[in-house]
Amino acid sequence: MRTDWTRDEIAALIALPFPELMFRAQSVHRARFDPTEIQISTLLSIKTGGCPEDCAYCPQSAKHEDGGVKASRLMAVEAVLKEARAARDAGAARFCMGAAWRSPKDHDLETVCAMVEGVKSLGMETCVTLGMLDDRQAHRLREAGLDYYNHNLDTSPEHYGSIISTRTYQERLDTLAHVRDAGINVCCGGIVGMGENDDDRAGLIASLASLPRHPESVPINLLVRVAGTPLAGADPVDPIDFVRIIAAARIAMPASRVRLAAGREDMTDEAQTLCFLAGANSIFYGEKLLTTPNPEASRDARLLARLGMHTSLAQA
């Protein structure tokens, strides 16, 4: 499987005539996956707000005081397990937990490890996103049984400095290396709609597809424009352009789960359907993604029923 994709190659894919691009993406998708299957995951914010980072898209940053998010303490383990049971009963096979930290403190990491162990005991796969990790922390999470660690690249290396100044691109790559070395599956993607150009979008997919090993899960987010954040006034993304990014991700990373993440609340059913045709085969289920709205579970169920698609047990 190729891990040497170039930006120019990805840009050429994205620029293909739409029918040709969709045909190629669907062909790649069918070679590895059941095209009628969608994986369901649930995401819970276990520690919200107060983050010292300055990510321009994120209302959880303490630097964006008008973002409308009040800082909270880390949730208790049993409260998290209650949410996990509800997610399992609603059909989720993977439970993802996110904490608004630059990096976790050791005592907080131990609490998260207890959460991981508890969720695993419910028969669910686990994923956490806690910010930057060192090698020791990654191995501790693996000891607890963690299946996946999410740490996104967000955008291209060139556009990155326009979005974040408190964490470097290399620091993100270093965390991903620690996660891989610990034997944890990688969940890594980015965000579309942050003022980037077409070349940046190709650069994001090329960066993901040229990692030493393709991420097992690739969440592609559509920017949720939150009042009070620097990107609140960003231009909306053409739905067809977004579908093109999904298709390019599927072609370049044929064995990865490509996940529709944040921004689905603003997508029409028709736009989501095109994303599924382009190779997206995973969604987040539930009314919120960390602090932003997500489609109601009933809307998702109705759409999947209309399309004759079914949900699956989590595997990537």
Swiss-Prot record:
Cite the Radical SAM core domain residue spans from the record: 36-264
Q: Which annotated residues bind [2Fe-2S] cluster?
A: C96, C127, C187, R259
What GO molecular functions are on record for this protein? Answer: 2 iron, 2 sulfur cluster binding; 4 iron, 4 sulfur cluster binding; biotin synthase activity; iron ion binding
Q: What GO terms in the biological process aspect are recorded for it?
A: biotin biosynthetic process
Cofactor(s) required, per the database record: [4Fe-4S] cluster; [2Fe-2S] cluster
TM annotation in the entry: none
Q: What Pfam families is this protein classified in?
A: BATS, Radical_SAM
Q: What InterPro entries does the record tag this protein with?
A: Aldolase_TIM, BATS_dom, Biotin_synth/BioAB, Biotin_synthase, Elp3/MiaA/NifB-like_rSAM, rSAM
Keyword check for 4Fe-4S? yes
User: Could you say which residues bind [4Fe-4S] cluster here?
Assistant: C51, C55, C58
Which reaction is recorded as catalysed by this protein?
(4R,5S)-dethiobiotin + (sulfur carrier)-SH + 2 reduced [2Fe-2S]-[ferredoxin] + 2 S-adenosyl-L-methionine = (sulfur carrier)-H + biotin + 2 5'-deoxyadenosine + 2 L-methionine + 2 oxidized [2Fe-2S]-[ferredoxin]
Q: How is the cofactor bound?
A: Binds 1 [4Fe-4S] cluster. The cluster is coordinated with 3 cysteines and an exchangeable S-adenosyl-L-methionine.
Which pathway does it operate in?
Cofactor biosynthesis; biotin biosynthesis; biotin from 7,8-diaminononanoate: step 2/2
| The enzyme's E.C. designation | 2.8.1.6
Q: Which UniProt keywords apply?
A: 2Fe-2S, 4Fe-4S, Biotin biosynthesis, Iron, Iron-sulfur, Metal-binding, S-adenosyl-L-methionine, Transferase
Q: Which family does it belong to?
A: Belongs to the radical SAM superfamily. Biotin synthase family.
Q: Which NCBIfam families match?
A: bioB
SUBUNIT field: Homodimer.
User: Known HAMAP family for this protein?
Assistant: BioB
User: What job does the chain carry out?
Assistant: Catalyzes the conversion of dethiobiotin (DTB) to biotin by the insertion of a sulfur atom into dethiobiotin via a radical-based mechanism.
> What's the protein called, per UniProt?
Biotin synthase
